[in-house]
């Protein structure tokens, strides 16, 4: 069993995963001025709340898109596990066949998503990861990572609208009953939820055209939290929502870098006969 953290600009997703699957997941606000001791206390309390003795942890791994927080979080993990965390980046084995202009610029979160998706699902595929930004990763029929797109995330778009205008309020994010809003709150919610769903549907169609694939040939996966699940449920294309995708990818990468990938591999139940590009 290992301790795994996925660090975004807004949140830190923490979890324990092992041969038997995911033991727990938790989420913290990413606070840049916290010390390693404060994060160590947060992590330790989370382990205790979920009944996981820290002595049982064989290792730890971090995927981070916030470099200034890396040292503090690595120290926090080392304090509670006594082990040096594996930080995903250049030099860490992931097994991906990356075909973009500068592979070193590919975000660690996108690497983790792709590793997990290739282990669980059939290529060609699109992987949507919705957080501070909405990202898409495209894997072609040969299992190669060929690119994607990045757009502003739903929450940051709503926050920009509320802070940059005089009359638009901050609203809770949920799907209204109708696309046509009849008050300001419902209009904002419709734009956020149905507008994002429409963007995703439109990009799926365009990506399929560029790949020369029929839309039904694409496996479309999305990961994220409750809001992202709500959005994907409003899409017209069939989308697999996998909220354990990131943890599964972190587990696979950790195994690959221990020289024991084949002996402890946790295969996803929905995996089909994908090309093994490892």
Give a label for each model feature.
Residues 31-38, 106-108, 113-122, 146-192, ...:
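Glycine-rich phosphate-binding loop plus the immediately following alpha-helix
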